[in-house]
């Protein structure tokens, strides 16, 4: 009977070891599942960052074009009263000129406005 008791103890120890291995395997599977979810989130965020970075070249180009539009005005154009002495060279009649207010001639020139321009890549990003 001594041999049987030793085999029984050996089998119980083996069973306990297998239960620990099973528990550790389940825990590792759970952690790997959570890690795969986090990796997929990181992947989506990386794609978003890549899309934003792809737009920076066009944004920089549009800002540059807008700032170049300001270069056509001299410093004197922004001084108060600089537009008062200039004559209206349009071919409008005097009746049409009477509808224009005096304030219209005294305003400073405004910079060109930025407008949205559709980019050909928009169709690709929607897919």
Swiss-Prot record:
GO CC terms: cytoplasm; DASH complex; microtubule; mitotic spindle midzone; mitotic spindle pole body
Basic and acidic residues compositional bias, start-end: 84-109
Compartments (UniProt record): Nucleus; Cytoplasm, Cytoskeleton, Spindle; Chromosome, Centromere, Kinetochore
Residue intervals passing through the bilayer: none
InterPro entries assigned: DASH_Dad2
Coiled coil stretches, renumbered: 1-51
Keywords: Cell cycle, Cell division, Centromere, Chromosome, Chromosome partition, Coiled coil, Cytoplasm, Cytoskeleton, Kinetochore, Microtubule, Mitosis, Nucleus
Superkingdom to which the source organism belongs: Eukaryota
Region (Disordered): 82-127
GO BP: any one term: attachment of spindle microtubules to kinetochore
GO molecular function, one term: microtubule plus-end binding
Residues annotated as signal peptide: none
Family stated for the protein in its record: Belongs to the DASH complex DAD2 family.
Purpose of the protein: Component of the DASH complex that connects microtubules with kinetochores and couples microtubule depolymerisation to chromosome movement; it is involved in retrieving kinetochores to the spindle poles before their re-orientation on the spindle in early mitosis and allows microtubule depolymerization to pull chromosomes apart and resist detachment during anaphase.
Subunit and interaction comment: Component of the DASH complex consisting of ASK1, DAD1, DAD2, DAD3, DAD4, DAM1, DUO1, HSK3, SPC19 and SPC34, with a stoichiometry of one copy of each subunit per complex. Multiple DASH complexes oligomerize to form a ring that encircles spindle microtubules and organizes the rod-like NDC80 complexes of the outer kinetochore. DASH complex oligomerization strengthens microtubule attachments. On cytoplasmic microtubules, DASH complexes appear to form patches instead of rings.
Name assigned to this protein: DASH complex subunit DAD2
Organism (species): Candida glabrata (strain ATCC 2001 / BCRC 20586 / JCM 3761 / NBRC 0622 / NRRL Y-65 / CBS 138)
């Amino acid at each position: 009977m001594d041999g049987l008791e030793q085999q029984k103890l050996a089998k119980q120890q083996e069973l306990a070891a297998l239960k620990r291995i099973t528990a550790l395997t389940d825990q590792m599977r759970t952690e790997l599942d959570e890690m795969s979810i986090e990796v997929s989130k990181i992947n989506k965020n990386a794609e978003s960052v890549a899309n934003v970075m792809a737009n920076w070249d066009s944004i920089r180009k549009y800002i540059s074009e807008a700032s170049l539009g300001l270069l056509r005005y001299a410093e004197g154009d922004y001084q108060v009263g600089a537009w008062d002495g200039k004559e209206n060279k349009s071919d409008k009649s005097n009746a049409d000129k009477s509808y224009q207010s005096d304030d219209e001639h005294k305003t400073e020139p405004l910079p060109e406005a930025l407008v949205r321009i559709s980019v050909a890549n928009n169709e690709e990003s929607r897919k």
